[in-house]
Amino acid sequence: MAEEEKIRQTIQELPLLPLRGIIVFPYMVMHLDVGRERSVNAIEEAMAQDRIIFLATQKEAQTDQPGAEDIYQIGVIAEIKQLLKLPGGTIRVLVEGLARAEILEYIDMEPLIRVRVREHIEPDVKSNAVEALMRSLINQFEQYVKISKKIPPETFVSVVAVEDPGRLTDTISSHLTLKTQDKQRILEALDVTERLEILTEILAREMEILELERKINVRVRKQMEKTQKEYYLREQIKAIQKELGEKEDRQAEGEDLRNKIAKAKLPKEVEEKALREVERLEKMPPMVAEATVVRNYLDWLLALPWAKQTKDRLDIDKAEAILNEDHFGLDKVKERIIEYLAIRKLAQKMKGPIICFVGPPGVGKTSLARSIARALERKFVRLSLGGVRDEAEIRGHRRTYVGAMPGRLIQGLRTAGSKNPVFLLDEIDKMSMDFRGDPASALLEVLDPEQNSTFSDHFIEVPFDLSKVLFITTANGMHNIPRPLLDRMEVIYIPGYTEEEKTRIALDHLVPKQLKEHGLKKEQVQISENTVRRLIREYTREAGVRNLEREIASLCRKSARAIVKNPERRLSISAGNLPSYLGIPRFRYGLAEAESQVGVATGLAWTETGGDTLAIEVAHMPGKGNLALTGKLGDVMKESAQASLTYVRSRARELGIADNFHQNTDIHIHVPEGAIPKDGPSAGITIATALTSALSRRPVRREVAMTGEITLRGRVLPVGGIKEKMLAANRAGCTTVILPAENKKDLEEVPANVKKKLRFVLVEHMDQVIREALLEPVPVQAPEPPETIPAAIETSVPVYQGMLEETPPGLQT
């Protein structure tokens, strides 16, 4: 009864996976890719049960739908360890062989092959004969590993550790590269002793073949001399070329290249160079590495637009209409391009100008260059220089380097297919240098109209005329551009947009663009002018319109979501319901300060992103006359604060401040947003005003903003960035701006609609600033003064009032 139960346990019904050209042995782990329908079904059934499957090899690998007669009877019961579904319906499985088994009968053939198999249980065989066979097999396998050099030594170490004879044969067989029939023969040997003998015989035969191969290779290497070797290789190449249908005669390639050179209309110097390279190519053996380099070089020479150029659109009215269609405002830039067209119409051989657009991010520098190319009907090429450190990016690599290529200028011209494109060098101020060279120095030749007609790339090695190219560069600021490079360019500054300009840009360009990109129609979403104005005032604070466009895109996304839910819905986004779409406002529109305060003055600053307001805070307390400066200030700004304090000390009596205040008072000057570096002299009068306010208890008028450099004598010197600062003052809601009298000429650049909203106070001396900016003192109870302060000023209110009733001589008009 026990014997019958044992037999039943070894007989199983399992799904069958037919293998093509692969034999899996017990204890062997292997990846299999399964794609046939019946095979996939077999895998899925095995996974649904206990992951056990039967693996048997087909007699012919080409058979797609094998039957019972097409599959070997002996196979392996295996366990599926992992399963991964690949694109296309293919399944990749990781299987591990468990035991040999024999097919007793086929139960089903569709939708999968299901068989009844009998598992072969390995007997425990231990005898001297088996031990001798095992030792012989291990020695043979060791020699095989040494001769073949295809099996790592670690594998041999793991094989030696196997003590079971059956497992030893299966492990060695799985590592040998044998024919399918030989491996199947080993698999079908159920007797362990017989299996050892078969594998020993096969391994001995394989070693004999390997030894013969080694001897043949050694003998052939010794017999072949250099000339015979070259002849043999040449004959092989000829035979391969003949089989591939290639021409045996290399003169045909040379003739083809000469014809291309003749048609390319190359300059004389370039044509001579190209013909010399063709002659070199014809003399070279066909498969040497240098031949590939020469072919690549000739391909580049012939692909460049030596004589190809587009015809400029010289219709000034049409070009102006295109520029106005793409961009609102930017009159200076448009005027410069129209001037260029006018001169081109009069002087045909004019060299291309080299223009540098400098301005904050988001004002349209890059898109303007693309619009200029469209207006001129020229090709457009853009090269981003941000982060470029290698000179070879500009000049290319010499041909001696592996994988050498021309610089990105030459590559751009090849892409354009024209010798006179509009070539944009974007972010020219973001270049840097390292041990590979300085790309800015390489650009000196490119951006010099007197030199770029003979620009020489390291790879091309012949001059290329860049004088027809209209180079446009862009930068956020000029301080990072090397002075020699800046000297070669015509700088056109593009300032930030006013609120009116932003409104028009949004309504005429950004809103229609975003509606189209989000698949919305104008009738579905209405965005009013007041909505755009609130967007500008309370959700963005920038010189350009990049963030404004992002906010409009956010409105479109939320609108699209609502319309998808209800296609009949029509949305009207007004200034009132804007927070329901974008959340609470991010910025406070209005006065820079909510109320007039003591010791707080509003200055104006210039940054690469446009103008901005700058609050200066001053506090004083009993101490020893120390001055503290915080807010990440630069050296120039620190010196400006020292000069302001010196001015206030020298004018203390006239300003209503105790003469000896500095002896017993510590002063702290702070500029908020301490993580942002700040520098420059233009905050001088603002610091002096805040100091005077704090020490005299006179509040600074909240609607006043100011800019100007101060001297020790109180003179107010001119500063830069006036237009940007006025735009910032207008954005902040200030109504009065104090600025140096010498900056009056710069007000011409301020847009008219901004000038209408601001009152400008032109000053030459600090006394005028104090008179305009400060209010009457705030009557507060002063703290108990130190003993050294004179009794006449121990109480703050009466003393301040008394001192201010008499008009100081410095404040007289």
Swiss-Prot record:
Spell out the GO cellular component terms annotated for this protein, sorted alphabetically and separated by semicolons. Answer: cytoplasm
Q: What keywords were assigned to this record?
A: ATP-binding, Cytoplasm, Hydrolase, Nucleotide-binding, Protease, Serine protease, Stress response
Catalysed conversion reaction: Hydrolysis of proteins in presence of ATP
The record's PROSITE patterns line, in alphabetical order, gives:
LON_N, LON_PROTEOLYTIC, LON_SER
SMART domains attached to this UniProt entry: AAA, LON
The cellular location(s) given in this protein's UniProt record come to: Cytoplasm
What turns on expression?
Answer: By heat shock.
Indicate the principal place this protein occupies in or around the cell. cytoplasm
Protein name per the record: Lon protease
Organism, by scientific name, is Heliobacterium modesticaldum (strain ATCC 51547 / Ice1)
Gene giving rise to this polypeptide: lon
